[in-house]
């Protein structure tokens, strides 16, 4: 996976370094593993791992705590793991009920209860806002940036989205721009156990600071239904989609049930209006959020637009019809959602004001390459840039120093397409 500088492009493995996403599936632990469920060896061990998770510490910090304790405890045998990795591996094969997450039953299906394991979303945001270094790099208001007479768009708070969002709220309030990231993850080498973590961060935080591990919070784990022999049936697939969106409703509703929310920053109450601005995930995950079909072979495979797959190679920009809340909800209400590659399931995000879930999702490079869309995106980009900017980009590419493993498009950006 590539190591990106932008949080918007961060890959799943970057998240997997930070805290507890390697746990076994709460719902799909195999019977033989249930028989061998363990507990932490002692209270000190349990307290350490709870501290590690609660404060979203990285491995380096956790190991420093262990080293400090062992040095000053004067105990012949340390009650702590030799390092944080050992503690995480132990949690891979044990019951994690002691960790500071609550659970809520979201579905009872075929005599089995499915739970959302979660931290309250307000608590996650409060944890971010309690970090003094994050607050130093926290933006409250839209910023209009210019250089040499040209408008600059460097962060979301300098773009039109923020400007328009700010105009829609009370004058003394502030926008709280929320990023959601989720991805179903296999947690064992055999691929038999999986989890569906969901994370939260804030686009109010400058990008370089947001890329650090402590600038994101694990909101919880979404349930993964046991398919057994019905995984391919339309009824089961619909139930899985409904469960996903019901889980999101449970997690996110507390942000939208009031006239904005007060959060304390530097001992002052600041009035915010939360807005979900970005949903990060791969292409199948984007399909789950937007409830479009999860197949590149479906007639309408794009979760952004209503372009038939046979037209992807010849579509003109003026023929593209963008998906949005209004036209997708109309198909749903008419019972014809499937005719446009949409699941006949109510989308939770239709109930949230000021969010277009189809625009909030981000392009996924790998699956777009699989679909063959990338070359057309390059063509559109070239047309938008114009000849002068295309030449300028080519000149910049040409002066990039060569390095082993670094791909340089020596023939210019047009060679990519």
Q: Where are the predicted features?
A:
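A structural signal for the principal folded core domain
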Residues: 1-417
């Amino acid at each position: 996976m590539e190591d990106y500088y932008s949080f918007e492009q961060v890959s799943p493995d970057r998240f997997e370094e930070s805290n507890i996403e390697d746990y076994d599936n709460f719902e799909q632990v195999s019977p033989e593993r249930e028989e061998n469920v363990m507990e932490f060896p002692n209270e000190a061990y349990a307290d350490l791992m709870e501290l590690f998770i609660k404060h979203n510490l990285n491995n380096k910090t956790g190991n420093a705590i262990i080293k400090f304790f062992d040095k000053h405890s004067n105990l012949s045998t340390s009650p702590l793991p030799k390092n944080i990795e050992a503690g995480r591996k132990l949690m891979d094969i044990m019951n994690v009920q002691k960790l500071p997450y609550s659970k809520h039953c979201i579905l009872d299906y075929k005599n089995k209860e499915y739970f959302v394991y979660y931290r309250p979303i307000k608590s996650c945001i409060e944890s971010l806002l309690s970090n003094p270094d994050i607050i130093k790099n926290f933006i409250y208001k839209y910023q209009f940036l210019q250089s040499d007479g040209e408008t600059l768009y460097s962060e979301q708070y300098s773009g039109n989205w923020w400007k328009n969002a700010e105009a829609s709220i009370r004058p003394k309030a502030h926008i709280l721009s929320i990023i959601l990231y989720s991805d179903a993850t296999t947690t064992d080498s055999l691929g038999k156990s999986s989890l569906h973590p969901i994370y939260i961060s804030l686009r109010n935080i400058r990008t370089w600071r947001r890329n650090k591990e402590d600038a994101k919070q694990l909101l919880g784990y979404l349930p993964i239904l046991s398919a057994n022999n019905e995984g391919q049936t339309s009824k089961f697939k619909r139930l899985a989609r409904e469960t996903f969106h019901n889980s999101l409703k449970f997690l996110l509703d507390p942000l939208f049930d009031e006239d904005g929310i007060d959060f304390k920053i530097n001992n002052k109450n600041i009035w915010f209006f939360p807005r979900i601005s970005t949903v990060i995930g791969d292409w199948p995950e984007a399909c789950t959020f937007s409830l479009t079909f999860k197949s590149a072979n479906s007639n309408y495979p794009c979760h952004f637009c209503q372009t038939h797959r046979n037209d992807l190679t010849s579509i003109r920009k003026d023929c593209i019809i963008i998906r949005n809340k209004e036209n997708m909800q109309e198909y749903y209400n008419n019972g014809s959602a499937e005719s446009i590659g949409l699941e006949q399931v109510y989308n939770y995000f239709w109930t949230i004001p000021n969010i277009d879930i189809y625009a909030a999702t981000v392009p996924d490079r790998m699956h777009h390459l699989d679909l063959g869309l990338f070359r057309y995106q390059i063509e559109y980009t070239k047309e938008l840039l114009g000849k002068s900017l295309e030449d300028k980009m080519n000149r910049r590419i040409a002066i990039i120093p060569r390095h082993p493993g670094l791909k340089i498009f020596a023939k210019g950006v047009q060679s990519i397409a």
